[in-house]
Amino acid sequence: MNQIEQKWQYIWQEEKAFEVSNASSKPKYYVLEMLPYPSGKIHVGHVRNYSIGDVIARFMTMQGFNVLHPMGWDAFGLPAENAAINNNSHPKKWTYSNIKNMKKQLKSMGFSYDWSREINSCDPEYYKHEQKFFLELYERNLAYQKESFVNWDPVDNTVLANEQVVDGRGWRSGAIVAKRYLKQWFLKITDYAEELLNEIQNLKEWPEAVRSMQEKWIGKSIGANFHFKIKDNEETTIEVFSTKPETIFGASFIGIAFNHPIIERLVSKTPEILAFITQCSHITRSSKLEKAEKEGVFTGLFVTHPFDSNIVLPVIITNFVLMDYGTGAIFGCPAHDECDHELAVKMNLSIKQVIKADMDVQKTAYTEDGILINSDFLNGLTSNEAKQEVIREFEKLGIGKRSVNYRLKDWGISRQRFWGCPIPMIHCEICGIVPVPYKDLPVTLPDDVNFDGHGNPLDHHPSWKHVNCPKCDKPAVRETDTFDTFFESSWYFMRYCNSNATEMTDKKACDYWLPVDKYIGGIEHAVMHLLYARFFTKVMNEQNYVSVQEPFKGLFTQGMVLHATYKDEHNNWLYPEEVVKKGNEFFHKESNNRVVQGRIEKMSKSKKNLIDLETMQEQYGADAIRLFVLSDSPPEKDLEWSASGIEGCSRFINKLEYMFKAIDSLKDDVNSEVNKELNRLVHFTIKHVAEDIKHFALNRAIARMRELSNSISAEISKDKIDVKTVRHGFNVLVQLLNPFIPHITEEIWQKLGNKERLYNLSFPAFDESMLELDTYIMAVQVNGKLRDTYEFKTSVSEDEIKQVTVSLPKVQKFLEGKEPKKIILVPRKIVNILV
């Protein structure tokens, strides 16, 4: 099998089979899988992702489209730098070596990529364009530097964006993330929050789950900002944001974030307060705060109520108010907010009901809207009426106003690591921050770097960071932070349209190819990569790089590939190939010691539940692997890897070769009876496989093709064979299977005597008239109960159906000589005789 696969891979390469032109009279179709990080080896999860995309690409080509199906490398990132530290070598060497190996693996799987458009994000010819783009953003005030609390990953020694913190831990390292105050570069994605939110509804071909995740991440809240005066210090106020300002008369405390500026100015930091602040510093907004126990510590400060100066409220540092949402301060209304209620019970704060409810708010918060009570001038109003009225009162008093808040914050793009795109800025003591002149781009990384594992090597490089200021020509230093790697992946799909363009994009090529018609990847990128790519597209549209407003017309999120985990007697993880099953138990192949089978989980290096792709290819071939990852589960669902599954796919491919030999040896028999049912099944399969592929029901398409192969095999085994229909059916089967298993189908197609390549052929056509059955079976009921069935010819009339069914012996038995009162027909399904 490997020889056949290598043969066709060579032919495709020599014939430039999958290279496409930007100038074509055909309609375009752009299918793209998320580009991989060059970690060294392609894993089975990659194969599933790319196999899905390859079926769509090959199918749409057969449908007459000019299909763009490119591949490239998301090549910057921490793993390369960590490998450099471990091996004392430059990450560039490690990365390029991995790219070479992974490209070879991808080609060995027969994926129909246009390699002439390959991009590599760590190539200066690629990242020089994004450096220029960053400078353009800086000129438009969409890029800026400021000091801010950031998420610091102590293992990777770098800053993480909010989206890269999962349950309080770094998304790569798993380390508990702390807060640090550092100078950082940001992009003003918040300027586009409303646009990004509103246009989610236009993404009709995206999964609802992803649209919902983006909507929640942007997190639009409509409410009011208003001020509380500090008691005994009325010149100082605390500004709060609230989505329910109408509950102001139920306020019993002010909650502030642990890093609110008022703490530095006015709060005496007792040991209790300091300990609580340290504890809170590990909280990020990505933590599951709603599940965390609500806690607080009193600051010693009080504020006065804006409508009644006799009411004073304590100011409390809480673990559920965060500085990066709203103003970093809220007023707590325990009767009508669950978090506030939990804290009030814990700290013995008052709980005052201000919305009418048929429940005891001392026990549980009532969070619905209703009629206001105990609220002075708001009494008797609905929640919405009260909200408008209280905001008008804030504005009249000059203490507040209506406001809109977003959960989304500006994108922090600074990373304190070496292996990334250098940020093209210079710091001068005289001139301040100075952009690198366009003519000096790209700013490239040095080759002579010492990796000692401590921070960013660019910080202590002897010469690279030292440069003269472009403005005053005095000594200055380069910015040593590098871009977050999501910067590169936010526009790479545009570069594929013409990867040799002298500018960032070839606008004419982008106008032809964009948006991407179908983008395929994991749902884990819903609020990082996919949101950033949408943001970049909107900005690049304004900069006249592209005409589209949205990058991806359709999105498909595939499921993960899972495998059982194994541990030895010392609790060490084992690779599947180290384990053998004997009966219902598992043992170590070498030691023969008992092995414990754990949960079936996502394949990961740490748990060693990986499948070595090269070993699988040697044993079964690329086609069998492709077929298995597509046939055993719907593509959007998780897939469990199984040895029996891949073996079954290998047997099916071998069966195709056997079928070819058997059919090739058949002689035409003019006396054989035409197999109408087989002919109907051929046309039925063509129609429904096409529909299945269009709807990404690839496992269902494979099941239909297996059914057709079984029917052809059954016909071959008969004494009298309809050779013509068998040959036609087998030719169709080979064509239908080609997008799924391209190597063996091209080989069989050639052996069948065909000159043209399958990849150049149109998808088989079906004849609608051939789908009609000559006969059909109807259920025959008496008074609604099934009594018999009968097969009718399609040409039979309703009167004939009634006559035949009434005269059936089994029906006569229940009629007992009586005449039917009524006969009800459901065409081609049921006859119900009423007596």
UniProtKB/Swiss-Prot annotation:
Sequence motif 'KMSKS' region, location on chain: 602-606
E.C. number(s) listed in UniProt: 6.1.1.4
Entry's Gene Ontology cellular component terms: cytoplasm
SUPFAM superfamilies found in the cross-reference section: Anticodon-binding domain of a subclass of class I aminoacyl-tRNA synthetases, Nucleotidylyl transferase, ValRS/IleRS/LeuRS editing domain
Pfam family, one: Anticodon_1
Coiled-coil features, chain-numbered ranges: none
Gene3D superfamilies tied to this protein: 2.20.28.290, 3.10.20.590, HUPs (3.40.50.620), Isoleucyl-tRNA Synthetase, Domain 1 (1.10.730.10)
Catalytic activity: tRNA(Leu) + L-leucine + ATP = L-leucyl-tRNA(Leu) + AMP + diphosphate
Keywords linked to the UniProt accession: Aminoacyl-tRNA synthetase, ATP-binding, Cytoplasm, Ligase, Nucleotide-binding, Protein biosynthesis
Entry's localization field: Cytoplasm
Domain of life: Bacteria
Gene Ontology BP terms: leucyl-tRNA aminoacylation
Motif ('HIGH' region): 36-46
Listed GO MF terms: aminoacyl-tRNA deacylase activity; ATP binding; leucine-tRNA ligase activity
Record-listed ATP binding positions: 605
Keyword Magnesium: no
CDD domains for this protein: Anticodon_Ia_Leu_BEm (cd07958), LeuRS_core (cd00812)
Family, per entry: Belongs to the class-I aminoacyl-tRNA synthetase family.
Database matches in NCBIfam families: leuS_bact (TIGR00396)
Protein name: Leucine--tRNA ligase
Gene that encodes it: leuS
